[in-house]
Amino acid sequence: PKINVAAEALSQIYLGAEEFPHIVLDNFLDPTMINAAAIDAKWLVNNLETESWRFGATDDHDSQLYKRGIPNIDDMPPAMQLVCLYMNSEPFLEFLRKMSGIEDLMADPTLDGGGFHVTYPGGSLNIHHDFNYKDDLAPERVYRKINLLLYLNEEWDTNWGGNLELWKKDLSAPFKVIELIQNRAVLFNIEGAPHGHPHPLNCSTGENRRSLAFYYYSATPPSNQLYDRAMWLKNGELV
């Protein structure tokens, strides 16, 4: 993307952001690349065999409603595969390292928990803190540091909801609400970074919220607790 020439300048914005390091980048990838991936995303929702999804049916626990995912790159069409391969490539990792200051940042080629995500009408993702370590990505335990979310909806009516909310560390309220715009990327350090889209989607039947998610790791442990699963906001605390 165009941002490759500006890692140092973006680093000041990223590291100096309110509450925790984060940045929103529009026009992130080449338009031809993102348009092809967006077409792939629409095709996947309607054509992929059920057993290829991370959830055999839409997940229906009360913190993650009507959401499905495809973490296996082999189950994705070619244009989406190309995006995933680029996001895990050494040139892109070098950009992330410069922007974040995390020198040993590594990708997860298995896309564990990430990859293609779709949420259907009525669906939501409660405010949560992500799982933050893996034992099977490297010889030693590694720790999740950065999330990158890339939106694939060609047209999204703001009245449908689904905006990403970044919350204050004290869990009192969101401090930033980010609209779904195709080719918009949201990057943030996950430590002390509650987030989600907690309000049910109000989109019409046949519409859905589509995105790609990528997670990046380091050998440096976090200063907060270790979580082997997502921790969900319940009654003012993460459980």
Regions found by a protein language model. Give the residues of each.
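A structural signal for well-ordered alpha-helical scaffolds and beta->alpha junctions
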Residues: 3, 30, 80, 89-93, ...
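Eukaryotic charged/polar low-complexity linker/IDR segments
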Residues: 147-149
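Short beta-strand segments
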Residues: 24-26, 115-117, 187, 213-216
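Non-heme Fe(II)/2-oxoglutarate
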Residues: 11-99
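Non-heme Fe(II) oxygenase catalytic core, chiefly the N-lobe of the double-stranded beta-helix
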Residues: 39-42, 72-78, 83-143, 155
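A structural signal for the main folded, soluble domain(s) of proteins
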Residues: 49, 57-70, 99-108, 112, ...
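Catalytic core of Fe(II)/2-oxoglutarate
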Residues: 122, 130-144, 153-239
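Fe(II)/2-oxoglutarate
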Residues: 1-18, 229-239
